[in-house]
A protein has these predicted regions:
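Acidic (Asp/Glu)-rich catalytic clusters
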Residues: 3-7, 29-40, 60-71, 149-150, ...
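Conserved, mostly hydrophobic/aromatic
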Residues: 5, 9, 32, 63, ...
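Hydrophobic faces of well-ordered beta-strands that scaffold small-molecule active sites
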Residues: 13-15, 41-44, 71-75, 135-138, ...
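Active-site-adjacent beta->alpha loops and helix N-cap segments on the catalytic face
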Residues: 22-31, 161-176, 295-299
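Alpha-helix-loop-beta-strand connector modules within alpha/beta enzyme cores
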Residues: 23-46, 50, 98-101, 105, ...
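An alpha-helical appendage that flanks or caps ligand/catalytic pockets
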Residues: 88-125, 166-167, 171, 175-279
Length: 308
């Protein structure tokens, strides 16, 4: 698959680390690095809860030894799949401290830290690592967006596709960057969904990720004007630890909301949405395909991109 993605012309391959819901990303990214020569390879995303920051530094450094400057570390606070481990997403301070510790370890420093979520005692890597390995932060809520603007090399933006909403999110990133006295980092927007000429099928396949927003990032429901009663009902019926398990909650959402928050339509519709995102000012657009035929959506996304 990695070879096909590279041959198709994609620039990035991101793999998730989602506790029990996905295979280990570092092993798969190492295989992808061996099979490709151009693809940028990263986690989207790991977190400081299921993996100690020191072990994340080791894993990222190892990937960089294999993939060279194509390696990227994507990290976030964690999400609902942590529930299966009896854990909760990291608090903002814990995420910020983890990023700082990882960077210091990659730079060859000895690190002692006593943070809310982890401890390090004179810890240092026993091998050389890439101090300049890019760190991308996954963000959706306003405070995490501001943190990403302040400290990240790139932002993995999870906010749907509505241009006004994306601008709102970018403003939060810019606020954080401005306070830190630095330019806006790279903006990598992630869009989930299905591209199919059968639009009802595409909408049905994308409903599950649309239900993620009322549960995890409800501010976007307010920004696009979703009825608060629908938001409440979706939150109450969202029972799965992973968005793919949220079928009952997703069925409550109107089509208009699904198509603003996810890729859910035919090639013409998606091409128009990609053109709007280009105008907003994101640096890269990344598709996370859903549905039964994910490769079909990847290929359709490539067709849409080539129309621009």
């Amino acid at each position: 698959m990695a070879r096909h993605i590279e041959a198709t012309g994609f620039d990035n391959l991101w793999l998730t680390e989602s506790s029990l819901h996905a295979r280990d990303p570092y092993q798969l990214l190492a295989l992808a690095a061996r099979a490709t020569t151009q693809l940028r390879l990263g986690t989207a995303v790991t977190n400081p809860v299921t993996r100690h920051p020191a072990l994340t530094a080791v894993a990222a450094a190892t990937l960089a030894e294999i993939a060279g400057d194509r390696a990227v570390l994507g990290i976030g606070a964690g999400d609902r799949p942590l529930m299966a481990l009896g854990a909760k997403p990291a608090r903002l301070a814990e995420l910020e401290a983890a990023i700082a510790a990882i960077r210091r370890l990659l730079a060859g420093e000895s690190v002692t830290a006593d943070e809310p979520g982890f401890r390090l005692v004179d810890a240092h890597l026993r091998f050389d690592a890439r101090a300049d390995l890019p760190v991308f932060v996954s963000a959706s809520g306003p405070r995490t967006l501001e943190l990403a603007g302040a400290v990240a090399d790139g932002v993995i933006l999870l906010c749907g596709l509505d241009p006004a909403v994306v601008r709102w999110a970018l403003d939060r990133v810019d606020e954080g960057a401005s306070r830190a006295g630095r330019p806006r980092p790279h903006i990598a927007i992630f869009v989930y969904g299905v591209i199919d000429e059968d639009e009802p099928a595409a909408i049905a396949g994308a409903r599950s990720i649309a239900a993620w927003f009322p549960q995890t990032a409800p501010i976007y429901c307010d920004l696009v004007g979703l009825d608060p009663e629908i938001t409440r009902a979706v939150r109450e019926s969202y029972s799965g630890g992973e968005f793919q398990e949220a079928a009952q909650a997703a069925s409550l959402l109107p089509v208009s909301f699904v198509q603003r928050m996810a890729v859910a339509g035919n090639r013409d519709r998606v091409t128009a949405q990609l053109a709007e995102l280009q105008q907003v000012g994101v640096d890269s657009i990344n598709i996370l395909p859903l549905g039964d035929d994910r490769m079909a959506t990847i290929n359709a996304f490539d067709e849409c991109w080539r129309r621009l």
